[in-house]
UniProtKB/Swiss-Prot annotation:
Lineage: Eukaryota, Metazoa, Chordata, Craniata, Vertebrata
WW domain ranges (all copies): 92-125, 133-166
Quaternary structure and partners: Interacts with the N-terminus of HD.
Localization in the cell: Nucleus speckle
Keyword Cell membrane: no
Keywords of the record: Acetylation, Isopeptide bond, mRNA processing, mRNA splicing, Nucleus, Phosphoprotein, Repeat, Ubl conjugation
Molecular-function annotations in GO: RNA binding
Entry protein name: Pre-mRNA-processing factor 40 homolog B
UniProt main location, coarse: nucleus
Region (Disordered): 171-277, 690-871
Ranges for domain FF: 276-330, 340-397, 410-470, 490-550, 554-610, 625-682
PROSITE patterns per UniProt: FF, WW_DOMAIN_1, WW_DOMAIN_2
Phosphoserine modifications at: 764, 832, 852
Amino acid sequence: MMPPPFMPPPGIPPPFPPMGLPPMSQRPPAIPPMPPGILPPMLPPMGAPPPLTQIPGMVPPMMPGMLMPAVPVTAATAPGADTASSAVAGTGPPRALWSEHVAPDGRIYYYNADDKQSVWEKPSVLKSKAELLLSQCPWKEYKSDTGKPYYYNNQSKESRWTRPKDLDDLEVLVKQEAAGKQQQQLPQTLQPQPPQPQPDPPPVPPGPTPVPTGLLEPEPGGSEDCDVLEATQPLEQGFLQQLEEGPSSSGQHQPQQEEEESKPEPERSGLSWSNREKAKQAFKELLRDKAVPSNASWEQAMKMVVTDPRYSALPKLSEKKQAFNAYKAQREKEEKEEARLRAKEAKQTLQHFLEQHERMTSTTRYRRAEQTFGELEVWAVVPERDRKEVYDDVLFFLAKKEKEQAKQLRRRNIQALKSILDGMSSVNFQTTWSQAQQYLMDNPSFAQDHQLQNMDKEDALICFEEHIRALEREEEEERERARLRERRQQRKNREAFQTFLDELHETGQLHSMSTWMELYPAVSTDVRFANMLGQPGSTPLDLFKFYVEELKARFHDEKKIIKDILKDRGFCVEVNTAFEDFAHVISFDKRAAALDAGNIKLTFNSLLEKAEAREREREKEEARRMRRREAAFRSMLRQAVPALELGTAWEEVRERFVCDSAFEQITLESERIRLFREFLQVLEQTECQHLHTKGRKHGRKGKKHHHKRSHSPSGSESEEEELPPPSLRPPKRRRRNPSESGSEPSSSLDSVESGGAALGGRGSPSSHLLGADHGLRKAKKPKKKTKKRRHKSNSPESETDPEEKAGKESDEKEQEQDKDRELQQAELPNRSPGFGIKKEKTGWDTSESELSEGELERRRRTLLQQLDDHQ
């Protein structure tokens, strides 16, 4: 069973372009599979025996008188053995190992009858010497995806597009060998061929060339075939002799063949052909050689070919006419193709002529072109219809060409104008278009360039605009660089002035307590201060303030350091401590080198204030202890048994109190005498007050005073109240006019009246004083808090010690009490004396219901003063 010859051999060469990579093994592309039920040509059906030519000892049947074609015989022999092949009539040809076949797509493949394999590549046993050398060459040809051939070297792994010289030399050898074979086979073309066409034999492998030496026996009764056989026997013998002589004798027979062809035709009249097809082909060649046209009649053709010996190739007239008609049909097709090619060539010639002619443009009319080129042969040879098509194509080509040329010219002009503008120093970012035009006309490069002068105005304006924008960008960049330089210089000036302030601080001229007015004379003489003047941003004064604020911000940290130094040194700041001693103690410590002088001074002031506060607190405590001692001494005098009298002398009673602790606590004798005298004065005042109280009681026994109810809004008292005694009443004063007393509200009188009644009828003056003092304290509490907060906000320290806070609070209380006393003393002379009571027939005048607490306090103090005066 034969393998399907239409299947491709394994392996397909990659169509990679040369990139330095070795390609895969080369193989032809796969053959498309055949439809089912269809076998490739020249192959038997599946299961059928192979052709007779492939069966050893079998010869295909031939017509009588036919010459058996040469059959290639190739046998695989052992190494060193010679391969011999000869075919003799009557002896069967040897079995062929390789046979050549044609695939459905026209490609040739080879089949091995022994191992039943088919390959695309020609076996080495069938190759000639040149083909073997070509197959052994390391360079192989491949094709890329685009179909372009490239070459790859299997040994050096190199790929290239150009064809190597080795391949060219080998192909020249192959062509020379093929030409030698054609010269060897040339005598065979002179002999008649068998009537049945046979496929061309495959290429002869290296070794002896097979020679056809046998003929088939003619059939009985075939006289014509016998004549042909007898005529071809001399030619066959000559051809065999030529093959036996080898390639060296082929060159000697070629001149003889040329001489035979150059002989007159009557000498070739004895030629005959082996089959009818060859004879018919010879008759057609005769008609072609005589250039018989396709529209010639049989009679015209006979006149042209009847004298040629090949006219008798077909013995029958019907066969001649049949061959003539076939020739006419074929010739007609050829003439049409020739006419089409001539017309195509004429159109191409006309198109090329019009495209290259200088008078042709894309705007030229067809009539104008016809008038210009109508007399030329290149124009007239093309038909009108084809000429217009060609003309339209030419116009399209010229329009495209002119457009491309215009683009190139525009690009060139723009580039030239840019170069000229770049080289003109007189053009800046403020130059106008009219000025630039004048500058361009004065420029020699622009004046000598005619194409540049014919440049489109819009393109020139666009080019100029781009140039101006580029100059503006450069100018803006230059300005930005200048601004950056200026800012950098200003920053350097500020840094230099900051360094100058650091120098002043290091020398001690600048500290946290420095002021600009004090430091200005030293600062204004420095050049770094002068460089700062006039520049935007922070001024020298701002930098000075910032510097001082930074020093002040370091106060608390430096204060802690100073306290640590004093603690380590065992030094304490007292009220009488001098700053020089304080600074002298601190200067011995290394930590004092980084301290600010102003902060040192502030710390000293703070510590000094604390010392003063402690001293004041100590004095206050001493005063409180003294007051307690004095109170104890007075209590001792008051509790003396028997009680002391007004006329008693201190020397008389001193011995009675010597052993008492209160007596011993008062160390000074003068203080004891003073306290004793004060006690006697109080005792005297008490006695006087007691006498006045008794007199008032006896004077009111027989009298009844009826008081009408008060008409004031606050009249919640009883209908009848006792008036104060005459000794406690204020002195009567002249009644004022309403105009004189308009500034004083009448409601105050009612409040004062109620206060006076309370003094006379409900209790002692001391109880009312205590109540007034209590109300006054309540009213003054918010003010004290406000003052405290204000005082805290003004203090240099945000955080103080508890002892310092207590001392400050006590100081503030004393200061507030002193201020109240001074205010009361200042208001006493300006106040209206007495109650200022307006009496009516019905009772006290209470026109106003409210008085301020301050007014009530002042009036209360006035009443107390008057009471003291009466006593």
